[in-house]
Amino acid sequence: MADSDDEYDRKRRDKFRGERSDSYRTERRDDRRAVGGSTGARDEWAERNPFRGGASAGGGGARHRPDYSDYRGPGARPRYGSPGRDLPPAKRMRPDWGDGDVRANPRFGGYDPYLMQAWNDHYQSMHSAFSHAGHAPPVRESIGGGGSDTLTQPAMLNLKQFLDTQDENISDSEVMRKYTEYKTDFKRQQLNEFFVAHKDEEWFKNKYHPEDSVKRSEEQRGFLQRRTDVFVELLENGTIGSVKVDSSQGDALIRVLDTCVIKLEGGTDEDLKVLDEKPKDLVVYERKTEPMESVKAMEKAISSPKEEKIREEDPLPAVVSPQQKTARSVNSDEENWNDEDAVTKKDLGEHSKDTDSKPEDKQLNKKKTKKRKRNSSDDDSSSSESSSSSDEEKLKEKYDVEDGLRAEQKAEAEKDRQEAAKAKQEPESSKLEELVGKEITEPKELDSKINTVENDDTLKSPEMTPNPIKRTDNGNGNKVEDEEKPSVDENKVVETETIDLDKIKDGQPRALHRTSSIFLRNLAPSITRAEIEAVCNRFTGYLRVAIADPLVERRWYRRGWITFMRDVNIKEICWGLNNQRLRDCEMGAIVNRDLSRRVRPANGLTAHKQVVRSDIKLCAKIALNLDERFRLWAEVPTDDSNSARADESSENGSGSTYGFNSKNPVLQNITDYLIEEASAEEDELLGLTGENKDTEGEAIERDEQLISVLDRLVLYLRIVHSVDYYNHCEYPYEDEMPNRCGIIHARGPAPVRVTNNDVQEYIKTYESKLQQFLTKTVLLSDEEIKDLGAKDAETEVEKFVQANTQELAKDKWLCPLSGKKFKGPEFIRKHIFNKHDEKVDEVRKEVQYFNNYLRDPKRPQLPEHPGTSKRPESESARGGGGGYRPPMYPPFSAMPYGFGPPMMGGGRGGRNFPPARRELPLEHQRRLIGYHDLDAPANSDMFD
């Protein structure tokens, strides 16, 4: 009774403990006294001691389990036990993986193609006993720890677990037959579930859909054919032969790659002259920050009421590229970025007049002031809007790290620009009469006059850089420009220089090989290319988009690259994309930097003659394999016989693979360079056995003729097939990437000496790294895919007809597709094939779609469960807590973790199965036989 009274007094004195601060309770917990018995410190109360609740209170302590704070991460522990104490696994209310896998990950936009409840039902139906004590394995484990997003297949039963689901009188042969069937059905089920989960996604259709995959293949083949034409052109004019794939010739290699890119972009020989020009310093564009003088000039500018109304009613969002000025002018969130172009459009427009009335000017200026000044005191009704706009401005300032020049520099730049514009007015107006009667040669004539303006513009914003996409006829554009210049005021002359730059740029070579790009870190599998293009087409200068293949470790999310023209303000476009969501998915747009090192060195050992000859052989094999895969050079009349000989020789692995007439120019007479030569007789007569070479090494021997042949092959693989040979990798979907032919690996500096063992080891290792290009992809046969659950088209059509044939009553049948009623099922069949033949065709395409997925030996699928793929024999036979996989059944009753009574097999290494169950068939079990020594005395004691 005394104990109860004391405990009641303590509770009453501490009744406000829930309102005290966490730090106070932590101190009280740390300063507690270690007093035994029931009258000890408060830390020994039942609700405070997690170890007493279940034992002394008959399980009542389960209401106060402290596990929840452990899974919330770092934070205060309100009222439970010491942070240093961890409960045994048997006390856990939920498993460690409860939060990570069941709930949708917010950064993936709630997308999860696999219904976790369905997985749980499927797995728990076989393993219902796992609900005890939270020891069940996760239905879907993550590879690489709990923080990984990698999905896996559910765990497959091993043979021991499968035996426990069968009858005890089953034979060994029957067990093995059923277990084989179980594994086959399990694999079929996983393939079918994966197909159903991803069949509506664009990336999956591009791989296996009977129509979409053909379109995608033809598109890729068109890219390759275009690259082949460019390579042949460069090979014929000597560009390819004039360069060596050495890291010392990095500039020449970059020039060749850029030449290819310009040709691929549709450039001409005139555009190639841009490669001879020194690149400008203005590479990374910054946000435009104009001086206040230009803002005031913009406010004084005159525009028609029609244009002003269009600007006010424009529904486009605020943050767009500065190049997108055909639709609207300055918005409330853009401040002064588009002021120059707004004035420019007024200069060129037919409705801009200098004779507008003064009241109208005041009214227009008042409207512009309201649109530009966020803190305007004249607008009383927009206080909340101005505060939100100021927040937006702060975010933009934080987003744009490199923000303009200082006020003094901007003022000086503005002054210099105005003086240069005044100096230009007289020469340009004198040329107006000459431009009317002859072709325009103004770009050359004005180069020297524009240099000073361009230097000043370099200190300003990239918006002054012209956009080569927006072009009109040079003659008309220049004529209109020059006619308007005499009538404009001083401020407008400054603004029209953008048009002058556009005019001059039209006659100059185009830098088509240089682009700006944005990287999308997070694209859901359900997002299509058309949706991304619809968003990007709003921005002027958009070129293309590349979407990578999905990754299983990222839950099939993809990455993307959006390519724009070089002269756009890429940061503003990136800001606009970050303010948009596609299918409730944040794309995570960031600016993609330019390539840092385009020519990267490889091992210098590759220049050795023996290695070069081996590389020629490997390059020729890869070129043949890839040409045949994409049907390049397939117009040869004897293609069938040649390909058959190529297949036969590739299986043999001999150099005779290249002994046929190929239309590929880099493979012609290739066998002449594959025959090795050596002065064996001379070495034998002189006693040069090569022992010294093996020990001391030999100098690098270069054969320029072999190297030139190899360089042609390496450049062919790099330009046509996007294979970087010296990096033993392929750059996928390069035709859609921002940098076509961006990176190449070349031979690095050669070592002084090299041993024969090093050479042989290098050749062997490098060939193993290139196996992915040397082996041909062979699709699975009909018999092989039948084991994987392939479908038959006619069978599926019959199932479709039966599913759409419903009997309502006697001699009364319904077709759900049309809602019509018929007297018999045969009429419905005829009706479906006649009126709904498109539905029948869809069923056949679906069957072909699924079978195409099964035929691919490298088909994407979920990785196997770790318990299925990694199950050592010694580990799988162990039970309890020491085994690799959890036991099939829990320990006996509610025993503590790892404990088992005698002869029950609990604990580490124990059996952990009820004794009534068996582990092996009856044939492998025998009756226990007792042994007794017949020579022993009758009543003797047994000591051993």
Swiss-Prot record:
Transmembrane segments: none annotated. GO terms for biological process: defense response to Gram-negative bacterium; negative regulation of viral genome replication; primary miRNA processing; regulatory ncRNA-mediated post-transcriptional gene silencing; siRNA processing. Residues 8-34, 41-50, 291-314, 342-364, 391-448, 479-493 have a biased composition (Basic and acidic residues). Residues 332-341 have a biased composition (Acidic residues). The modification Phosphotyrosine is found at Y80. It is found in: Nucleus. The modification Phosphoserine is found at S82, S304, S332, S352, S429, S641, S643. Its main location: nucleus. Residues 1-101, 291-493, 640-661, 852-887 are annotated as: Disordered. Coiled coil: none annotated. Residues 365-374 have a biased composition (Basic residues). Keywords: Nucleus, Phosphoprotein, RNA-mediated gene silencing. GO terms for cellular component: nuclear body; nucleoplasm. It comes from the Eukaryota. Residues 321-330, 651-661 have a biased composition (Polar residues). InterPro entries: SE/Ars2, SERRATE/Ars2_C, SERRATE/Ars2_N. Interacts with cbp20, Dcr-2 and pasha. Acts as a mediator between the cap-binding complex (CBC) and RNA-mediated gene silencing (RNAi). Involved in innate immunity via the short interfering RNAs (siRNAs) processing machinery by restricting the viral RNA production. Also involved microRNA (miRNA)-mediated silencing by contributing to the stability and delivery of primary miRNA transcripts to the primary miRNA processing complex containing drosha and pasha. PANTHER family: ARSENITE-RESISTANCE PROTEIN 2 (PTHR13165), SERRATE RNA EFFECTOR MOLECULE HOMOLOG (PTHR13165:SF0). Belongs to the ARS2 family. This is Serrate RNA effector molecule homolog. It comes from Drosophila yakuba.
